[in-house]
Structures are given as C-alpha cells and as structure tokens.
C-alpha cells in the first residue's frame, strides 16, 4: 500500500506505528474477523502537508524471512517530498523465496530527482535471483507519458495490467489529485 499516512502528533502504539495509521487500522479490522495470520510492516519517506508521516505498508501472510526499507532517491530527508523510500518484505511461499516491494515513486516531472536513476536503484537493489514483485504507484500515466512508461518497461519490469486477460479501461484516478494540478 502507498500513502499510508499517520498524523505526526498521534499517539504511538508500537515501534513507529501510531494510533491512526491506516494500515494498522486495516489490520485491526481484519483481526476482528478472527484472522490473526497477518504481519504488518510500515515505513515513511517524508512529511506531507506539514502534518502527516507519509508512508508505505505491506500486509503479509506467511513466513516472513526479511524486512527492509531503503531510499531509492538521492534525497533522503523526511522534510523533502522528493525523498522516496521503498519497503521490501521477503516471504517464503511454497518453498520459494519471493521479494515484495511497496513503491511510491516521484512524478516524472520531479526536477529534484533523476527518475531513471531512482528506478535503477529500485530494480538493482539486490542481485540475488529471487522472484521480485514491485507493487505500487509509479506515478506514470500510460496514456499521456508513453516515454516514461516505456522507460519502466525497458528496465525489465512487466506491467500486470498489460498481462491481464480481463481488463477495465486502465484508469484508477479520473480527476486531478494533489500533485497533479496543471
């Protein structure tokens, strides 16, 4: 999950997780249905709107082998919106080690960061042969930013939307949101 925020001033519940952390609230709801096999991991990249710790989360079910967060950007300051962390959770599933990465990349128009370099840092974070699944928001519009979209594909990544046998129209956000203003 991306943009899993919590208010800076909220009460700490455990580790770096606060009472109003959406992922924690989701896990609590899942647990209320009698599920208890999920683990929750969260980290944040930067402060948003002067009041939120803006972060990434992964809910994992199964044997967790490793958890790591790292910056893919040259900016690594929580006070810079250009700072982007990646959350990686490694699971063992059916005797196979699989790395899951929750990503929220900068917009291609970000002038403070080299998007190609950020993607390179992400894709080449580990050199092992484990299956890697990159999930999240790459902030690239397939319809209007073909060059940027193709750059992602040229890095060796597969777009699961393109691989799907059944598809909708491919648009998840139909109007401008914060950061997309003209």
Language model feature labels by segment:
Residues 16-20, 113:
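Soluble non-cytosolic domains of exported or imported proteins
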Residues 24, 28-31, 37-182:
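Active-site regions of metal-assisted phosphoester/phosphodiester hydrolases
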Residues 1-17, 160, 164:
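Active-site neighborhood of divalent metal-dependent phosphoester/pyrophosphate hydrolases
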């Amino acid at each position: 999950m991306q943009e899993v925020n919590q208010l800076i001033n909220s009460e700490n519940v455990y580790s770096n997780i606060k009472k109003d952390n959406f992922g924690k609230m989701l896990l609590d709801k899942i647990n209320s249905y009698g599920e208890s096999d999920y683990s929750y991991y969260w980290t944040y990249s930067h402060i948003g709107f002067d009041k939120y710790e803006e972060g990434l989360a992964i809910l994992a079910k199964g044997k967790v082998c490793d958890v790591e967060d790292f910056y893919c950007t040259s900016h690594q300051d929580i006070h810079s919106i250009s700072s982007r962390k990646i959350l990686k959770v490694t699971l063992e599933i059916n005797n196979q080690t699989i790395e899951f990465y929750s990503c929220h990349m900068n917009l291609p128009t970000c002038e403070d960061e080299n998007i190609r370099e950020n993607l390179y840092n992400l894709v080449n974070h580990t050199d092992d042969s484990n299956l890697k699944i990159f999930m999240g928001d790459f902030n690239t519009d397939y319809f209007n930013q073909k060059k940027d979209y193709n750059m992602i594909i040229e890095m060796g990544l597969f777009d699961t939307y393109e691989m799907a046998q059944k598809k909708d129209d491919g648009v998840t956000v139909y109007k401008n949101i914060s950061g997309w203003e003209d």
